[in-house]
Amino acid sequence: MMQRYAVGIEFCGIRYRGWQTQQAGVPSIQETIEKVLSKIADEPIILHGAGRTDAGVHATNMVAHFDTNAIRPQRGWLMGANSQLPKDISIQWIKEMNTDFHARFKATARRYRYVVYNTLNRPALLHKQVTHVYQTLDVDKMMLAARKFEGTHNFETFRAASCQSSQPVRHLSHCRLTRHGRYLVLDIQADGFLHHMVRNIMGCLLEIGQGCYEIEHIDTMFAAQDRKAAGVTAPADGLYFIQAYYPEHFELPQHPLGPHWLNLPDEIPNI
């Protein structure tokens, strides 16, 4: 009998070309995990993720699911997979699910954090795990600007030219920027994200922080509905997929949002 499992995955995206399986020879998170699970199950496994992260993007709790005929205790799946996965990928939890659960299509919202290391000297130990910005930033202005993205908007200007989504309207339930010592953290949640959307919003906020334009210019960007009207795309290095949300009846395990070395609260910043 086919059994569906949900899993929570943590990964460092530095060595991978994103979540989605690529052409032969190009490493991806999805394919790497599928190979290990297929070996444990002794049958082909297809993994369905809640999101599709870009090359170099990280995750603290990417929710995914797979179906299998193999009978294994949950601890067996967890320990078996983690003993064979590369050290930069780890399954944090696993749970048996009914077949009405789908990691992608049943998700009601997704949440990211983008981490900027804002000091003169670049960090060595956090190489490619944060985005280093050495310039002095007007953080108060950036915090106000971030709130402009909340609500329902047409994000045509803030998606990649190659984005394949059929429509660019998204609802952001929150978009908050906070400072934690040397770190700036953008915490952003939406019903769905477009390709490069978070990185383009972060790029806009960084330019505002550097005095390139005023907060009100965001309205002009939205009105233009043209990618060329916005600023640069922020690097993938500082971006973390931290959570996907589902109806409560699925009872998925609670997992700290992370990134864990920052020790941030899970609650939405109240600013």
Curated annotation (Swiss-Prot):
SUPFAM superfamilies: Pseudouridine synthase. GO terms for molecular function: RNA binding; tRNA pseudouridine(38-40) synthase activity. InterPro entries: PsdUridine_synth_cat_dom_sf (IPR020103), PsdUridine_synth_TruA (IPR001406), PsdUridine_synth_TruA_a/b_dom (IPR020097), PsdUridine_synth_TruA_C (IPR020095), TruA/RsuA/RluB/E/F_N (IPR020094). Pfam families: PseudoU_synth_1. Disulfide bonds: none annotated. The keyword Aminoacyl-tRNA synthetase does not apply. Its EC number is 5.4.99.12. It comes from the Bacteria. It catalyses: uridine(38/39/40) in tRNA = pseudouridine(38/39/40) in tRNA. GO terms for biological process: tRNA pseudouridine synthesis. Keywords: Isomerase, tRNA processing. The active site is at 54 (nucleophile). Substrate binds at residue 112. HAMAP family: TruA (MF_00171). Belongs to the tRNA pseudouridine synthase TruA family. Formation of pseudouridine at positions 38, 39 and 40 in the anticodon stem and loop of transfer RNAs. Homodimer. This is tRNA pseudouridine synthase A. The gene is truA.
